[in-house]
């Protein structure tokens, strides 16, 4: 059964069906969010996209060995595959936690509120963008994978609660300029990333990082896993 699941997983990725499905739902969601009359459909499609992607993340956790979580099979890649699976999943949800709670809202990040730095045994509190390949591997080796999964689930749940409470008018709101300085004091993201987030309105943030960012890194994880699978 395990072999069948793995073969099916990698066949789907190879023929591009999954990319196409994610892309279509993502485009529909983006179009829906632009109009008040279709806004609620946009939120539904966003939640559906995230659930579909979370199913892939769940499968990764269920079928990946501890060693494969910190493997780096594409060290020369210039794209998102130049990463470990552990780092990629941490990165997805760390960014989402920061954006949901510190950029859009004025709340304590789940990472800090629930002591996930200690629970995950994380050597960093940031998004991880600053790590070299060697640092990324070392970071991933000591990360508590079960607590990483717990963090991902809590962040997803928290973000989706916010999404369901948003109105169409609220999504037009720009991030206040003064938020930049506050975010810098947290020391959780590079300046260029803070500038990027604060240059968006809430609708723009729903599109990235709450959806497209997931697609980019989940698909990278699946390619990493596929490469590791072929080596065995």
Predicted regions and their residues:
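Extended intrinsically disordered or low-complexity regions, especially N/C-terminal cytosolic tails and loops
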Residues: 2-68
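Short glycine/proline-rich turn/loop motifs
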Residues: 37-38, 132-142, 193-202
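A structural signal for alpha-helical segments
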Residues: 41, 45, 76, 80-83, ...
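An acidic intrinsically disordered interaction segment
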Residues: 47-59, 174-187
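Hydrophobic faces of stable alpha-helices that mediate helix-helix packing
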Residues: 54, 58, 152-156, 214, ...
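Acidic/histidine-rich alpha-helical segments that form the ligand environment
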Residues: 123-174, 205-211
């Amino acid at each position: 059964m395990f072999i069948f699941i793995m073969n099916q997983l990698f066949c789907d990725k190879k023929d591009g069906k999954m990319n196409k499905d994610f892309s279509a739902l993502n485009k529909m969601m983006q179009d829906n969010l632009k109009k008040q009359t279709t806004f609620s459909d946009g939120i539904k499609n966003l939640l559906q996209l995230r659930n579909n992607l979370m199913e892939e993340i769940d499968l990764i956790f269920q079928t990946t060995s501890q060693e494969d979580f910190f493997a780096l099979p594409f060290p020369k890649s210039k794209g998102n595959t130049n990463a470990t699976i552990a780092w990629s999943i941490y990165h997805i949800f760390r960014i989402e936690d920061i954006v949901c709670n510190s950029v859009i809202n004025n709340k304590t990040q789940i990472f800090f509120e629930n002591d996930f730095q200690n629970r995950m045994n994380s050597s960093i509190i940031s998004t991880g963008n600053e790590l070299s390949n060697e640092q990324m591997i070392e970071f991933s080796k000591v990360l508590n994978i079960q607590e990483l999964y717990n963090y991902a689930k809590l962040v997803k749940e928290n973000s989706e609660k916010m999404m369901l409470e948003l109105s169409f008018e609220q999504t037009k709101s720009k991030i206040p300029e003064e938020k930049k300085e506050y975010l810098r004091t947290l020391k959780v993201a590079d300046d260029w990333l803070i500038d990027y987030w604060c240059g968006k309105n809430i609708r723009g943030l729903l599109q990235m990082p709450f959806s497209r960012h997931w697609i980019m890194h989940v698909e990278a994880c699946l390619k990493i896993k596929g490469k590791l699978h072929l080596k065995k």
